[in-house]
């Protein structure tokens, strides 16, 4: 279990099975993004997430965070998954925003969801609509090394159902 404070990555609890979790945050006051990764996601995707969260915690602009991540991929410091990488955001206590930049709107607890990382994926590769808004399956960061198929699920980690008011942002 990891967290980031003042630019430092903190190990809150050591694991033994390759699965790891991170309490991510962005520039918004109150943003809370609990996210867990399978072993391949821990080896690859989580390092990108930690880099982004660390830079944001230092007040780095979102454009600069994006450039730093792209540069880290280009230098081989960050690597795309070689096999299925999975992340899941199942906590009903998540506080999400529509975008990590200052223009992002508070969404709150959006939907519990799984993210399957498929580098270079596009909605068309899965027969999905381009924007995916309101759909149970969508593609985030299409066409990039960070592309992910996002699949909404009906229950939170505690077993409670998604409230009818969950927002589709």
Enumerate the predicted regions with their spans.
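Primary mode marks residue(s) on the alpha4-beta5-alpha5 output face of response regulator receiver
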Residues: 1-169
């Amino acid at each position: 279990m990891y967290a980031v404070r003042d630019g430092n990555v903190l190990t809150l609890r050591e694991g033994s099975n390759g699965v790891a979790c991170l309490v991510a945050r962005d520039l918004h006051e109150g943003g809370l993004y609990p996210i867990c990764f399978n072993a391949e996601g821990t080896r690859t995707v989580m390092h990108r997430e930690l880099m982004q969260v660390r830079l944001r915690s230092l007040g780095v602009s979102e454009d600069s965070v994006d450039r730093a991540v792209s540069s880290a991929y280009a230098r081989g410091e960050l690597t795309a998954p070689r096999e299925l990488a999975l992340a899941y955001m199942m906590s009903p206590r998540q506080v999400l925003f529509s975008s990590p930049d200052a223009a992002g709107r508070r969404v709150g607890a959006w939907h519990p969801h799984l993210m399957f990382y498929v580098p270079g994926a596009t909605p068309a590769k899965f027969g999905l609509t381009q924007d995916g808004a309101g759909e149970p399956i969508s593609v985030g960061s299409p066409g990039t090394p960070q592309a992910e198929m996002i699949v909404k699920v009906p229950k939170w980690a505690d077993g409670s159902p998604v409230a009818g008011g969950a927002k589709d942002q």
